[in-house]
């Protein structure tokens, strides 16, 4: 009984965080679209690409860094090149960044494509907030992952 209650509470908390993440994602949807498909040539898709990032060693950290510090420079996603700027969302609380990352990792099925996916936590975000990177340095982190 206690285990069932504990599982219910934990899953309920994750569902609440995802609901908050969906609300926060509304700030992202103007560029990346509500369905995560992006706008070809202008704003890269998140759906499908988040799983590719999460599968890489260091991918979780990279996603957090993108939200904290932004991203600037040319990238390639699904064979299409994008050369723009993603603004920082450092004004969000650590819990909010974790929530929106959990949303983009689960909303379009990407988490199911990554073996052993674990939800992002505010503690992970807090730890990386101390790094103080530029958007260009975040781009360099992307390249270290082997992503274009």
UniProtKB/Swiss-Prot annotation:
It comes from the Bacteria. InterPro entries: Cyt_c-like_dom (IPR009056), Cyt_c-like_dom_sf (IPR036909), Cytochrome_c-type_DH (IPR051459). Residues 1-17 form the signal peptide. The keyword Iron applies. Heme c binds at residues 28, 31-32, 86. Binds 1 heme c group covalently per subunit. The modification Pyrrolidone carboxylic acid is found at residue 18. GO terms for molecular function: electron transfer activity; heme binding; metal ion binding. Keywords: Electron transport, Heme, Iron, Metal-binding, Pyrrolidone carboxylic acid, Signal, Transport. Gene3D superfamilies: Cytochrome c-like domain. This monoheme basic protein appears to function as an electron donor to cytochrome oxidase in T.thermophilus. This is Cytochrome c-552.
